[in-house]
């Protein structure tokens, strides 16, 4: 998180007259990579056009095409397009910098796929730049996305598996592999994920969310990928664009969906455009460093000052992460096309948007609407990190907000539930409002949300302390959490390693980012253990690689979690059913998922004593239920007052009406 806002800001939104003063961090390390091979076109040289973005486009798209063209003095040129009917220049927009043009291109309905040529003319001289207009995949616009039927597996690629050691350190990229450093690059890559897709499928996951894979070429701490230096290229230490598309294809072959993590809010201070931005207000500029105040309530607080709102949405996320100005229509169009380009080019299934409330909310609503206009069934989940339920609900599209705002954001991350799970499960002698009652209380506020099915529920991710640490390294509590993730409303996300109770390396504390993002044992040649295999899990013991369980416990946790999520895949009553829950008693919690055909009963004993299930308390829904099956054992289950549930354990029973 960034530091409190500094004084002396320029208050206007369109700050075109100020001198751009940059922190010098990382600019020297920025490398500008041409978007094409200049040798491929004899009369186009790299000093005339250094890049054109988007890199390509398609016929049959709803989004009008606007090309960002960069080249020294390019604004002095006229632009036309040749190569066939149906593709033409509609308008040429000049920027503040003479080294950019924004060219509006019409791709008519009769345009044919193929290579066209952008012709740049000046003083009787001209040169050409090849540009591909491809045919869309059949059914691309109607593509499906992640839903309540999915379980999402979150991977931090640098820490998952190293499938290609040859790209660990790359010339021109100063941050080299250093596996002994918690904030260094460890060498995980796209090939490593491809190599372990079977493990992910075996766990029961149906979708993968990777933290950003696009280029982050700052001098240090680049492993996380959240400071982009080139939006259209995969970081070479992870692979390349073609390998990323292969990864998506191979995942689809195994019925795994791919969700891309994107960050329109901020770019790296070493991004290629920072040496010469198209417009003076391309990003938010202050006379001294000004971080966001992170007061998200200013977006919906009727009493908030404009000053506080401005600093919240315009302040920088970090000194190395500049805040993009989405109020500039060319910036907004850039990010709309960029998102659509990756969906179409790589065949993506969803987006996770980082730091969603940091953005200017109205342009981001337009961004969401543009993506949904192109792909009506596409899903986007936004990271709106707040434990205030009304504030969280405000960001979900379709909500009847008093100010009339509609984000068009379909899905949100359930941070209130995340915090309630972690706090409640470790309170063995709870007072009023504590223990498992915390979870009951969170669900009692479900009336606030517009669409409960589009809630991402999660017990941990790459930004929060390891689940194993939060639950005090108690595997029974981990099992309770996994059972709740598999049976509650919404769709679950599990952070890689939590299914094995990874813990932080505790470099400073359990919440330290470098420490909690531990390497997955078995992902590197020479690792002492391989937790990707059943044999490796069975033999796993305490070590220094983020695992702290007795021998055999890793296998037990994995098998428990895998069984649950494999079972969940086909349970429509979980995906789309209603919920009925009952007030907690003695740190126990009972809830039912039900529809016209099926009922699933979940009983959580979070106490330190065995408990008899109070069936009469649940008569409203349980009366008459017969022929139950214990989900974990497959054995028949009958309602009986003699049923005892062990301390810190969970019972799941399914019935057919």
Model-flagged regions — what are they?
Residues 160-345, 364-374, 379, 384, ...:
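Substrate-binding/active-site clefts of carbohydrate-active enzymes
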Residues 28-29:
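C-terminal motif of bacterial Sec signal peptides marking the signal peptidase cleavage site
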Residues 638-657:
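C-terminal beta-strand-rich structural cap/linker in extracellular carbohydrate-active enzymes
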Residues 163-181, 185, 386, 452, ...:
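Loop/helix patches that line or flank the sugar-binding groove of alpha-linked glycan CAZymes
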Residues 61-124:
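Immunoglobulin-like IPT/TIG beta-sandwich domains and homologous Ig-like subdomains
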Residues 374-460, 519-539, 548:
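Glycan-recognition surfaces
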Residues 34-76, 129-138, 142:
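Beta-strand/beta-sandwich contexts
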Residues 133-154, 159, 163:
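Low-complexity, Pro/Ser/Thr- and charge-rich linker/hinge segments at domain boundaries
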